[in-house]
Amino acid sequence: MKKTFVAGMICLALCAGSTLTTVYAADVKQPNLVIILADDLGYGDLSAYGHQIVKTPNIDKLAQEGVRFTDYYAPAPLCSPSRAGLLTGRMPFRTGIRSWIPDGKDVALGRNELTIANLLKQQGYDTAMMGKLHLNAGAGRTDQPQAKDMGFDYRLVNTAGFVTDSTLDSAKQRPRYGMVYPTGFTRNEKPLGRANTFSGELVSSEVLNWLDNKKDEKPFFLYVAFTEVHSPLASPKQYLDMYSPYISAYAKQHPDLFYGDWADKPWRGVGEYYANISYMDAQVGKVLDKIKTMGEEENTIVIFTSDNGPVTREARKVYELNLAGETDGLRGRKDNLWEGGIRVPAIIKYGNHIPQGMVSETPISGLDWMPTLAQMMNFSLPTDRTYDGQSIMPVLEKKELNRLKPLIFGIDMPFQDDPTDEWAIRDGDWKMIIDREGKAKYLYNLKQDRAETLNQIGKQPEVEKRIYAEFLKYKNDIDNDSLMKARGDKPTPVTWG
């Protein structure tokens, strides 16, 4: 499947927006695309992002060979809406997903939404996904879009929001650490039963097998969505041994704790969390090494990122005990709109076609990948819908990116103890958080106050007025989205309980 690419790209601006197109020689095949998504990986969880203990050599190497972003934002601070935004390029609320999706609920990606896979399939790509989907309420919901409907020809899907072993009799018997052989995966809608390995290796092995069995010369899109480092943590002994000094004596004596017992047990130490990151990194390495062995490294765009911020040591629920995500000093965590909940690692590599070893401080969003890839891979975006991102090709060409719209984020968390932070908007160095009543509650200059400690509400009236007006305009556009109206969706809060 060896392909070539025209290194000299000619970019033409097409209209007042940021849409650009790349002119290719007629006989040049398109590049491959691999998107690798980690689950709940924090901004400070990788050595490439400053972690002093965790070893992530494969992701570090990816950063050295590509572009690493310091101000990259996941589309949302929760799994389901973030994944919806990443794959569609649309603010998650537009897609019908405002929060994480519990099993059995009537929530799923809107049927009139189009993913990157849908669009690349139209261009003749082979498409496959391996890992966590979480864009519907389960594999049994035939009334809801499944991975096949989202454009994936081949599918190894974890049908829930996390992995578990349902062969055990009750939740109390299901191990949280050490040995979780998942039962929730399906291959092309057929249940696999209980796996004989942990989730990460199950996913990476499937990727390698799919590539080995791919016989045609078509370009491919692989969406690899690891369940690591979402709880339950499950890592082979060799990775636990790497961080033995950071695992408590009690944890070493009791490698399996059970769901009903955690709250009355001693702290297990951070080592199990560190081990799970290194285990995930090794699986990333397997995928990247395979692409290199195939001779496709120079012709493959690789994107690595996380769906949202981490669960930190400040556990809110019993199932969060003993997690140890790091934000590198950013305020907040998964499920809120502080920087720690939405600013995450992100790296893009594309051989010699984009800079190598570059670090960009330009604020970008997971919603930017769709228009960026449309330009890089020479496919058109539908004109019947609003896209919230814009191409970041200027950044990859070492030019300044002129943002046409601010970055906007939303959260609708029905189980949140204090659900006050529903919206956030970033424009340049300024970020505003708006509460559920629509009141501007916080304003920060992130260039001067990265940790969000100095609230400027009432102190910067002109900035406050300008950004709040931008928010109202943007929110109105989202609430009146044409695809939402076509589905009959209403911009109302999530109320399940």
Predicted regions and their residues:
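Bacterial N-terminal signal peptides that target proteins for export
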Residues: 1-9, 19
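Formylglycine-dependent sulfatase
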Residues: 10-13, 22-442, 446-476, 482-483, ...
